[in-house]
């Protein structure tokens, strides 16, 4: 997908201003410059950066808006992105929306890049340079994680950062359905799988009301 094709998709599905385009361009320039120092994304995806990474991230925003409208909820205000790495989807969401976005990334060099990228794009974000389990929990309206951890581990670590109405938007590969099924013994909630607009073999797990199942205990005799 070219830059022009990506911008057309963004305008049709989200609505973007000239200022937003400038912020995206600044972020892309920063990422390209940093690639000389660290591998932020796979080299094989650099030529399709706008489709493989930017639109792949941006597609989560219409899903969030659709979910809020369908359930007649107030617009979400806080977004937690786990393992933000190169800024996908966290910084892209921050550029495209007015939500308060918090990025969690434990790797020092990635944290330094996220700080530079957010400054270059003129986009305010909160960056927590720690492991998730070492962060004081607070509840967020939306939680995302792109290649962060297997689903069961992800829910176990991130559950303290959710409330009952939190929306989970979790990009996964072709094994999304299998991964979801494997969690049903320990977790419950409302879940569905949405197709990815950028890769027919990928999917997005959409979930709400996630909480651990009460484990049955054996009866005393």
From Swiss-Prot:
Positions bound to S-adenosyl-L-methionine:
83, 88, 132-133, 146
Query: What does the record give as EC number?
Result: 2.1.1.170
Matching Gene3D superfamilies: Vaccinia Virus protein VP39
Kindly give the InterPro entries that the UniProt entry links to this protein: rRNA_ssu_MeTfrase_G, SAM-dependent_MTases_sf
Q: Where is the signal peptide?
A: none
An example Gene Ontology cellular component term from the record?
A: cytosol
- Intracellular or extracellular location(s): Cytoplasm
Q: Does the keyword Transferase apply?
A: yes
One GO MF term attached to the UniProt entry: rRNA (guanine-N7-)-methyltransferase activity
Query: Could you tell me the keywords of this UniProt record?
Result: Cytoplasm, Methyltransferase, rRNA processing, S-adenosyl-L-methionine, Transferase
Listed under catalytic activity are: guanosine(527) in 16S rRNA + S-adenosyl-L-methionine = N(7)-methylguanosine(527) in 16S rRNA + S-adenosyl-L-homocysteine
Q: What is its main location?
A: cytoplasm
Membrane among keywords? no
Q: Which family does it belong to?
A: Belongs to the methyltransferase superfamily. RNA methyltransferase RsmG family.
HAMAP family given for it?
16SrRNA_methyltr_G
**What job does the chain carry out?**
Specifically methylates the N7 position of guanine in position 527 of 16S rRNA.
NCBIfam families of this UniProt entry? Answer: rsmG_gidB
State what protein this is by name: Ribosomal RNA small subunit methyltransferase G
Taxonomic path: Bacteria, Pseudomonadati, Pseudomonadota, Alphaproteobacteria, Sphingomonadales
Question: Gene behind this chain?
Answer: rsmG
């Amino acid at each position: 997908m070219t830059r022009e094709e990506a911008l057309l998709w963004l305008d049709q599905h989200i609505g973007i201003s000239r200022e937003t385009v400038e912020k995206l361009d600044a972020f892309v320039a920063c990422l390209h410059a940093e690639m000389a120092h660290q591998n932020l994304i796979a080299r094989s995806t650099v030529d399709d950066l706008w489709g493989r990474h930017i639109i792949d991230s941006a597609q989560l925003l219409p899903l969030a808006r659709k979910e809020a409208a369908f359930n007649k909820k107030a617009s979400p205000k806080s977004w937690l992105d786990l393992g933000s790495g190169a800024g996908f989807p966290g910084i892209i969401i921050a550029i495209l929306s007015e939500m308060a976005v918090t990025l969690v990334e434990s790797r020092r060099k990635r944290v330094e890049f996220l700080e530079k990228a957010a400054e270059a794009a003129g986009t305010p974000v909160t960056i927590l340079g720690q492991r998730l389990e070492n962060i004081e929990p607070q509840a967020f309206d939306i939680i995302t994680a792109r290649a962060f951890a297997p689903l069961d581990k992800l829910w176990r670590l991130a559950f303290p950062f959710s409330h009952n109405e939190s929306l989970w938007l979790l990009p996964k590969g072709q094994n999304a359905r299998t991964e979801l099924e494997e969690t049903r013994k320990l977790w419950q909630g409302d879940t569905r799988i949405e197709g990815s607009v950028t890769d027919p073999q990928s999917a997005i797990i959409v979930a709400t009301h996630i909480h651990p199942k009460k484990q049955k205990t054996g009866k005393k005799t």
